[in-house]
From Swiss-Prot:
GO cellular component: cytosol
Organism placement in taxonomy: Bacteria, Bacillati, Cyanobacteriota, Cyanophyceae, Gomontiellales
The keyword Magnesium appears for this protein: yes
Record gene name: mnmE
Keyword match GTP-binding: yes
EC number: 3.6.-.-
Subcellular location: Cytoplasm
Name of the protein described by the UniProt record: tRNA modification GTPase MnmE
Role of this protein: Exhibits a very high intrinsic GTPase hydrolysis rate. Involved in the addition of a carboxymethylaminomethyl (cmnm) group at the wobble position (U34) of certain tRNAs, forming tRNA-cmnm(5)s(2)U34.
Length: 460
């Protein structure tokens, strides 16, 4: 624990100057109530009981000066988030009053909480398992409703259940094997068919859970999409139609966009950062050259590139030059201005590669956006993301540990097939148990905990 035995305090809400009607200062620890009683004056006959809200004033105990009119929420152990005594001051919003209240708490004996320390205490006291604790951070940082739902499912324990069952199965098998090692003459032989079946069933379940990792990563970090192409093919019009706003300036003059314009969208539950880039061409204009260079960098940094061309002019040498630079990226060809060509137009004639994913749009008329989103989802999900039928998903840390468990179980299968001594079976089973315990928090090092909770905000 970062501040073992001490009462911690922090501002639990975002501080935005001149915005927000309420700001919360949170205390947790054995001295939380005593500190609150030194700072808070509750008029009348209000009773300091658990899970009650008191009305009153936060005062400086040295001067008696009132700092803020506030509500106080009291939650005594173990019926609190951390399973310690927890007190919250619900102050007026803004920056000044809430910071003064926090400072008074620190002067009264509390120490400033480190990032994630409240949730760390909840984990250490058994209020949350490690998957639930990580889901708290995911819920706070969710960038889409689907990401929030996945985090909430993890917080409700839906991820821990299959993991605990897997670990129990491995422990049961290990116990059976060790019993045969220690008491071989007193017990019947191992049922190899049953053990092999249990190992195979466990591997099937591990693979099912691992299949959610890509979906989880997309939900948490989102997708970066770069719109590239030569000048005046309709890149900015595409961004505006897609974002349903005038994010980018649109004119008939080549080189209007000089810098990367960003917009944030949600496509099929996946947060998407869209980068509208400057038209790529040879130019002597120094400012435009900088914009072109940034376009190249945006394309290289993107998870997916939308190469936009003009249906009126078809495939040009400039398009080919750009395609050569981005063809190794995940790529979709967008044939824009389809409304300006006749019905005899053949989009396949514009393809530099027959296998290239393409679609047609009329961005100025807001046409083709649904097709664009469908193509993006198909591209990043391979048609349908594995594990998409589950309402939760694992993160990269959990996937790495689960992959180790999978390899260990596969080693057990190989050991059984090769009829190696039972001692060899136990080595890989213990590693599988250890790897699964790292996910649930039953076997986890202090350095892993530090890494996990360092990404939390202060006050959570």
């Amino acid at each position: 624990m970062l501040n073992p035995g001490q009462t911690i305090a922090a501002i639990a809400t975002a501080i935005v100057p001149q915005q927000g009607s309420i700001a919360i200062v949170r205390l947790s620890g054995s001295e939380a109530v005593a500190i609150a009683q030194r700072l808070f004056i509750a008029p009348g006959q209000q009773v300091w009981e658990s899970h009650r809200i008191l009305y009153g004033y936060v005062c400086n105990p040295r001067t008696g000066q009132r700092v803020d009119e506030a509500l106080l929420l009291l939650m005594l152990a173990p019926r609190s988030y951390t399973k310690e005594d927890v007190v919250e001051f619900h102050c007026h919003g803004g920056m000044i009053a809430v910071q003064q209240v926090l400072q008074l708490c620190l002067e009264a004996g509390a120490v400033l909480a480190q990032p994630g320390e409240f949730t760390l205490r909840a984990f250490l006291h058994g209020r949350l398992d490690l998957t639930q604790a990580e889901s708290v951070a995911d819920l706070v940082g969710a960038k889409s409703p689907q990401a929030a739902q996945a985090a909430l499912a993890g917080l409700q324990g839906k991820l821990i259940q299959p993991l605990q069952q897997l670990r129990r199965t491995c422990i049961d098998i290990l116990a059976e094997i060790e019993a045969r090692i220690d008491f071989e003459e007193d017990l019947p032989p191992l049922d190899l068919n049953q053990i092999s079946s249990q190992i195979q069933h466990s591997l099937t379940e591990v693979n099912r859970i691992l299949a959610t990792a890509d979906r989880g990563e997309l939900l948490r970090t989102g997708l970066k999409v770069a719109i590239v192409g030569r000048p005046n093919v309709g890149k900015s019009s595409l961004l505006n139609a897609w974002s349903r706003s005038d994010r980018a300036i649109v004119t008939e003059l080549p080189g209007t966009t000089r810098d990367v314009v960003e917009s944030y969208l949600v496509v099929g539950g996946i947060p998407v950062q869209v980068l509208d880039t400057a038209g790529i061409r040879e130019t002597s204009d120094q400012v435009e050259q900088i914009g072109v260079e940034r376009s190249h960098k945006a394309a290289q940094a993107a998870d997916l590139v939308l190469l936009v061309i003009d249906a009126q002019t078809g495939w040009t040498a400039e398009d080919q030059a750009i395609y050569t630079q981005v063809q190794e990226r995940s790529l979709i060809l967008v044939i824009n201005k389809i409304d300006l060509v006749d019905q005899a137009f053949q989009p396949q004639a514009c393809l530099p590669d027959p296998a290239l994913t393409y679609l047609c749009t009329a961005a100025a008329q807001n046409q083709g956006i649904e097709d664009l989103e469908s193509a993006i989802l198909s591209k990043v999900q391979g048609g349908e993301l594995e594990g998409a039928n589950l309402d939760w998903a694992i993160n990269q840390r959990q996937a790495a540990a689960l992959t180790r468990a999978k390899l260990s179980l596969e080693n057990v299968q190989e050991t059984i097939a090769n009829q190696l001594p039972l001692d060899f079976w136990t080595i890989d089973l213990r590693e599988a148990i250890r790897a699964l315990g790292e996910i649930t928090g039953e076997e986890v090092t202090e350095s892993v905990l530090d890494q996990i909770f360092s990404r939390f905000c202060i006050g959570k």
